[in-house]
């Protein structure tokens, strides 16, 4: 190793440590703010800037290693990776482009809308969105990390806010994740059977659960994809290390730091990407602990992930829906293990052929490359096993199956190794190989039966989303809708608020509210009104008190949905409050015509002849 290269590594490590020290000082400053609310208010901006920094690190690092990686991979592998990315995007079109988690996916998209216009990662309790502008009146910090909304914000900046642009992202990420797995396995210095990388990438794409969730706006496909990118980055760093000294390049360390930190911003358990990176480095060279560039990557990745750590700390008291407050406990293991383990054997979500291939791959690694097997088993154990401890981590319902997507990448690698190993073993027995391949394809195709479907538990909620999509274009400009789900209306370009946010104004200043929104004040009788009796009773009372005017109604199963106008004459008389201040120049057409007619001098009658 030359003196200059050693110096560059020392400078890289010093830079990373300096950034980490600066981040620690910033964290201490935030921790000493006078109130918890002040500390929490830092989160919406700091998380966005943290992800900006991650992208800068990734792009800069990639620029530094593009040439050596290009020489190693060659044109054929690069074109194959491009083909996999396109194939993954197109394959996700087999599933319907809908939302399956109600209404988390709309919250993610609406936060992306907010980031687009304000640069802050907040969901809107009350906002005005008209004429391409967005104005936040009442914000809320979502408990989930903001990686998905951040990526959506870039799509929205380019293509605008729409269902099509929202669903484009996950489809693209599925394809890119497959390409990352292929390139990572091409780069990692593991001994693997020929063709394992390509087989793993294709099997990842056509994993039924990946396709089913790949055409939604759920966070699990991006979470899986960003961990796959981190896997690619660590494989690149391991491949570019000096084989004699085990020292990595600063540029690949920068890429590794940015990719690892960025993966943290998608789900709370995404923090487990750190031990994944460590075990992959160990599996490629047990001298990894001597790699100064890797230590620099760890320091910088920790600094880049700090804003998300602050976010998670700020929502530490959230129940996440756990009725007794226990989010993780060993008491959930038995029940969750039945469903999550059964995923591989009951042929409901996953083909049994895939399980057989994964077992073959694991056995091949056990005999030929145990360190690689340990690394992949660790990845799977963390990505799949963490949900066994989670109170809602079992695949009991269609929506819960999304957690299985997070572990699909390591399972696909095991399957890919299994396919490649069997092909190498049976290629001289084509009849047997063809018969086994046909059986596997039949089983796989049969397991994809649910890919083009929705799911029963989502029907009523999807009907509410469809109802909003149909009604929103009929509302006039300057309207506002009170709804338990303002995010959906805001995404459709309609001003909206949580009911509780404007409740006092509705009951005391209806005239002022109607003055601010001359297009009308509306109440959305939603999916939640059918599920929450207290909310339904309060809204029904308001509709009666205002003699609300029905605008649209629809029924799905036993759920009734509707939109009502509540700024009626009765509402203005009962809840009107103080008259709004008159405009400085009153130029209303009808008023001006009335004044002109009143001021007109009657014409003199014509003289009698």
Region roles according to the model:
Residues 44, 50, 109, 213-214, ...:
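Hydrophobic/aromatic-rich transmembrane helices and adjacent perimembrane loops
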Residues 58-69, 177-182, 281-283, 348-377, ...:
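Hydrophobic, aromatic-rich transmembrane alpha-helices
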């Amino acid at each position: 190793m030359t003196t200059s290269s050693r110096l560059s590594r020392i400078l890289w490590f010093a830079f990373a440590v300096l950034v980490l020290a600066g981040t620690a000082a910033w964290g201490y400053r935030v921790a000493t703010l006078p109130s918890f609310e002040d500390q929490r208010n830092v989160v919406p901006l700091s998380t966005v800037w943290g992800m900006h920094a991650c992208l800068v690190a990734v792009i800069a690092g990639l620029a530094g290693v593009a040439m050596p990686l290009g020489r190693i991979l060659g044109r054929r592998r690069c074109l194959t990776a491009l083909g996999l990315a396109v194939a993954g995007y197109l394959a996700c079109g087999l599933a319907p482009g809908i939302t399956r988690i109600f209404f988390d996916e709309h919250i993610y998209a609406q936060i992306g809308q907010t980031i687009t216009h304000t640069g802050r990662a907040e969901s809107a309790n009350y906002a005005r969105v008209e004429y391409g502008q967005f104005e936040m009146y009442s914000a809320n910090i979502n408990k989930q990390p903001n990686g998905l909304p951040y990526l959506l914000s870039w799509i929205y900046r380019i293509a605008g806010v729409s269902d099509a642009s929202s669903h484009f992202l996950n489809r693209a990420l599925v394809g890119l994740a497959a390409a990352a797995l292929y390139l990572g396995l091409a780069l990692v210095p593991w001994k693997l059977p020929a063709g394992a990388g390509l087989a793993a990438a294709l099997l990842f794409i056509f994993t039924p659960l990946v396709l089913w969730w790949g055409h939604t706006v759920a966070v699990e496909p991006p979470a899986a994809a960003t961990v796959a990118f981190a896997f690619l980055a660590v494989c690149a760093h391991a491949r570019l290390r000096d084989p004699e000294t085990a020292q990595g390049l600063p540029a690949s360390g920068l890429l590794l730091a940015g990719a690892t930190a960025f993966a943290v911003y998608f789900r709370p358990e995404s923090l487990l990407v750190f031990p994944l990176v460590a075990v992959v480095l160990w599996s490629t060279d047990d001298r990894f602990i001597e790699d100064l560039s890797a230590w620099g990557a760890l320091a910088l990745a920790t600094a880049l992930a700090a804003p998300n750590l602050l976010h998670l700390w700020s929502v530490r008291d959230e129940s996440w829906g756990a009725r007794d407050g226990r989010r993780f406990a060993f008491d959930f293991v038995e029940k969750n293990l039945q469903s999550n383990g059964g995923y591989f054997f009951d042929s409901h979500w996953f083909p049994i052929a895939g399980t057989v291939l994964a077992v073959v791959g694991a056995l091949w690694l056990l005999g030929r490359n145990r360190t690689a097997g340990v690394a992949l088993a660790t990845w799977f154990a963390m990505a799949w096993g963490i949900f066994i401890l989670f109170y809602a981590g079992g695949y009991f319902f269609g929506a819960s199956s999304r957690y299985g997507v997070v572990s699909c990448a390591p399972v696909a690698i095991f399957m890919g190794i299994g396919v490649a190993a069997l092909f190498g073993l049976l290629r001289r027995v084509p009849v047997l190989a063809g018969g086994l391949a046909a059986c596997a394809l039949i089983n796989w195709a049969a397991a994809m039966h649910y890919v083009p479907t929705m799911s029963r538990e989502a029907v009523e909620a999807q009907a509410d989303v469809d109802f909003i999509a149909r009604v929103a274009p009929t509302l006039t400009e300057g309207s506002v809708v009170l709804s338990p789900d303002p995010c959906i209306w805001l995404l459709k370009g309609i001003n909206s608020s949580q009911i509780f946010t404007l409740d006092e104004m509705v009951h005391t200043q209806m005239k002022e509210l109607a003055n601010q929104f001359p297009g009308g004040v509306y109440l959305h009788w939603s999916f939640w009104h059918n599920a929450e009796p207290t909310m339904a009773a309060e809204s029904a009372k308001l509709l009666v008190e205002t003699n609300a005017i029905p605008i649209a109604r629809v029924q799905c199963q036993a759920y009734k949905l509707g939109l009502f106008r509540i700024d009626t004459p009765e509402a203005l008389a009962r809840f009107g409050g103080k008259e709004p201040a008159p405009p400085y120049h009153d130029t209303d057409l009808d008023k001006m015509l009335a004044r002109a007619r009143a001021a007109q001098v009657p014409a003199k009658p014509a003289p009698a002849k």
